[in-house]
Amino acid sequence: LGGRILLTADCTLMSDYRHSEFLGFGTCAPPNFIPDFLYKWLFFPPINNQKGLPTSAPYGLRKIEAQLLKEGFSVKTVSPDNLRKYIVQAQALGIHVMDPFGLGPASSTLAFILKKEPFLAQYFRALLDSPEIRDAKKRGLKIIVGGPGVWQFQYRPKFAEKYGIDCIISGEAERVVGKIFQAAVRGQQLPQYYEISVEDAPKLEEIPDIVCPSVNGLVEIGRGCCRGCSFCSVTLRPLRWYPADKILHEIDVNIAGGNAGTILHAEDVMLYGSNNTIPDDKKLLKLHQAVVKKCEGVTWSHCSLAGVAAKPKLFAQVAEIIRQKQSWWGAEIGIETGSPELAKKIMPAKANPFKAEEWPQVVKTGMGLMHDNWLIPAGTLIVGAPEETEEDVIKTIELMDDLKDVRSLIVPLFFVPMGRLKGEEWFKETQMTNLHQELLAKCLEHGIRWADELIDL
């Protein structure tokens, strides 16, 4: 297939965040007392390049790159700072987005607090507004946007037309991306918004392995989630776990590219290989033994408190394997609420295999085990969920008191309508109550308490 295709992302995504994914959350903040150039250098410096091509790139972009190469396209992934060098001959440009308008929970919360637009929204717009892209559009370049953040375009309906975006792809694109880019390089009309249904999601054997390194060695170990929380969009996707050899092959690609460590990515790493909410001891241990043998360091993207609490002995065994080469590791976790009543309403299966009304105890047990085994969680709370009552907020404040001795960061995030709750109202700053302010203060106090120890690790 002919046609030159470029893939890129804005500079807040084309960074390795100084080899700390947690620093990537700095892109969610708006401009502040730190000068912009210094803030960028501190939190999202540009990735290393070889001849204008990044030595690593966001994992989702690498998957699309692999699929297009598999289908015979001429494709290059380029850094935004080096687009000018390659875009002259390009017929189509694919752009990966995570939080293009700063409407995600973390960025919208920080935007409210600091009253400014987040960096990630500013740099996405600046990318599309760059002279090289504007010039390429005039000669017929097609722009295709995809990634986890495309849902935000529904709140900015005129943006795509204003900035010359020809097609927005929503969902897992492996099955369709080839035909859309083929139409683009042929100069054909593209669908303005292409939504991929659950039925059209790729099967395991249809998902290609990455062929070039991903940022910070991140590799997917599975897709989808079986818990069905109403506020989450991932749970709308079918659950699939990659076989270990597929995961290890992608780790080899990253190691060959200079990434000695890896981030195992799934919505719940503890459930690797399981088709329900009970961890599979054999598969989880076998995977970690193989990964630690290859890598200098391992961390997780996400895991569930219920999965940890369900199998304390298994979790301790996994921790022992991981800590052979490192003193600690991290993961993002969803605490969401301290209220059993709210848990029953918006996330009845999040506590499985325990009952929803046991949720506060599940949180305390899971986080206690993490503390004992040196997993340092970055926990999130939902502020302003639909049907939230004052009593629910009080219960969450009480839970924060119970967690004060757990080594962790806990971040309150304003409710954003996603998943099955996408028709609900956004939580607005005018809805902030004294109780909400008390909860935010508790989280800040908790973070300050643990900051010194976490920085020293």
Report the location of each language-model feature:
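Radical SAM enzyme core and accessory elements
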Residues: 1-31, 36-37, 225, 437-457
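N-terminal pre-triad scaffold of radical SAM enzymes
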Residues: 2-12, 200-235, 248, 252-255, ...
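N-terminal [4Fe-4S]-dependent radical SAM core
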Residues: 16-21, 53, 179-219, 261
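A solvent-exposed, charged loop/short amphipathic helix patch at secondary-structure junctions
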Residues: 20-51, 100-128, 346-355, 432-445
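Glycine-rich beta-alpha loop elements in corrinoid/cobalamin-binding modules
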Residues: 60, 76-204
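Flexible glycine/acidic-rich beta-alpha junction loops that bind and position SAM and/or redox cofactors
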Residues: 101-105, 263-277, 336-350, 383-391, ...
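Catalytic cores of alpha/beta
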Residues: 154-162, 314-318, 387-402
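Conserved SAM/AdoMet-binding glycine-rich loop
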Residues: 255-377, 383-388
